[in-house]
From Swiss-Prot:
It is found in: Cytoplasm; Secreted. The gene is BthD. Transmembrane segments: none annotated. Residues 1-22, 122-249 are annotated as: Disordered. It comes from Drosophila melanogaster (Fruit fly). Expressed in the developing salivary gland at late stages of embryogenesis. Also expressed in brain, neuroblast and wing disk. Coiled coil: none annotated. This is Selenoprotein BthD. The keyword Ligase does not apply. There is a cross-link at C34-U37 (Cysteinyl-selenocysteine (Cys-Sec)). May be involved in a redox-related process. Required for survival and specifically for salivary gland morphogenesis.
Amino acid sequence: MPPKRNKKAEAPIAERDAGEELDPNAPVLYVEHCRSURVFRRRAEELHSALRERGLQQLQLQLNALGAPRRGAFELSLSAGGMGKQEQVALWSGLKRGPPRARKFPTVEEVYDQIVGILGDQQESKEQTNTQKSSKIDLPGSEAIASPKKSESTEEAQENKAPTSTSTSRKSKKEQKSEEEPTQVDSKEAKQSKELVKTKRQPKAQKKQAKASESQEEVAEDKPPSSQKRKRTTRSSTDEATAGAKRRR
């Protein structure tokens, strides 16, 4: 029998040809596509070229970066790049779509709009971080310039406060004097009114006393001497007994 021939080692499919030398500062389009049909890979390459023609010339392509793909998969994700380690943002999932097979592939417009939105948000975040850094760098110089201005302003404020405080003290004294004067006038007026009331009440009381004395004198003159009470004579018990004995005799 002829000796058995050893099987030739199958050459690995070059899935990462397009992504051998990736620029970390440029965005990357990751595509996981099924190997059972060549249509999946062709669609991925056509999508990448169409996006570059639309204006995304820095967009890079990476096919099946995680190894063996899933059956019927056509998964798209984007890494914006330029900020160190970037998380992949999912753009499309063909496993959740189909049959028919045509539903597994997105249109160029849908993918383009999503990528532009993600890159625009990243650009805004970069600008914000740059402005914050520049403001932090400028802070020490601005503080040094602002500190003498603050000291000068505080000195001026203190100087302005000194005359204002004296003027306010004078005003307060004047107000106190003006308040005390009307109170004194009011107290004098109250005393005078009380004295007038007393003087008015005294002649009235004297008149009443004179009238009362005159009425008492008139009553005493009008009473006759016969009006005095006469003492009533009462008989004693001994007189009654003697009178009764005389009658019997």
